[in-house]
Amino acid sequence: MIDAVVVSRNDEAQDICSFELAAVDGSLLRFSAGAHIDVHLPEGQVRQYSLCNHPEERHRYLIGVLKDPASRGGSRSLHEQIHNGARLRISAPRNLFPLAQGARRSLLFAGGIGITPILCMAEQLAASADFELHYCARSSERAAFIERMRGAAFADRLFVHFDEQPETALDIAQVLANPQADVHLYVCGPGGFMQHVLESAKAQGWQEACLHREYFAAAPVDTQGDGSFSVQLNSTGQVFEVPADQSVVHVLEQHGIAIAMSCEQGICGTCLTRVLSGTPEASRPVFLTEQEQALNDQFTPCCSRSKTPLLVLDL
């Protein structure tokens, strides 16, 4: 864990604030484009926020936070309680959304607050890589970091699309035409926006291996069909029943076995656990690729279920 202090807080757009964090002892760990940190909030919540400053910077971490009406308390706490000089505990950076090695060209797509990891990618790619960035927002008032991007070295590769300005509409079919194996796509934003970009890419013939995404929130899941199952800990042989209305994490907690977790939605990867036997319900760790899901060898015990009566976990 890192003890951090809020050096500055700025309004970046309507309902979006940035928070510049520095280590109390002056040292911060390296990070790569696409990385995020866990932020431990005053009321006990832990939330993940993408780093959006240049990845070569070592003196600060910059995060952007949307005050979401559907917030479970995290974004509201930051907006209403955290000001300059506030102390926060944060994790080391972790990256589940890295840039692909060896890509000849990159297409970056961001919707709303999804600009945060994408902006960091653009900063890294700007030095020597071929890319373009498409940023979609409802209006100019809701476009975060827009002036920073328009003044950046990659401004000529920035394309901004506002819902209120139909003439700026994104022609996704044209942008995604002629897919190639060494061209990679990255997308982050609201679920509907991401689905539109990814489905459009697949319709154009893009390979799954070239499609990269990061979700900030999981889509609603119908849990009515959830049933009970059992998990076995490989290290001890203990077996625990998981009722339909409880998660694996909560069941293990009741027996004194703690698993680090954060989002409880299968999006952050904190609790990702190897499955040694049995078949997990693979769609709920939404950050896994289709190929990774097909392996059936890992799942997120904060929310994932099982297709088989027993899962043997690498715990």
Curated annotation (Swiss-Prot):
Cofactor(s) essential for the protein: FMN
An example Gene Ontology molecular-function term: metal ion binding
Listed Gene3D superfamilies: 3.10.20.30, Nucleotide-binding domain of ferredoxin-NADP reductase (FNR) module, Translation factors
Binding positions (FMN): 1-94
Residues annotated to bind NAD(+): 104-217
One Pfam family hit: Fer2
Organism: Pseudomonas putida (Arthrobacter siderocapsulatus)
Family that this chain belongs to: Belongs to the PDR/VanB family.
Gene coding for it: vanB
Name used for this protein in its record: Vanillate O-demethylase oxidoreductase
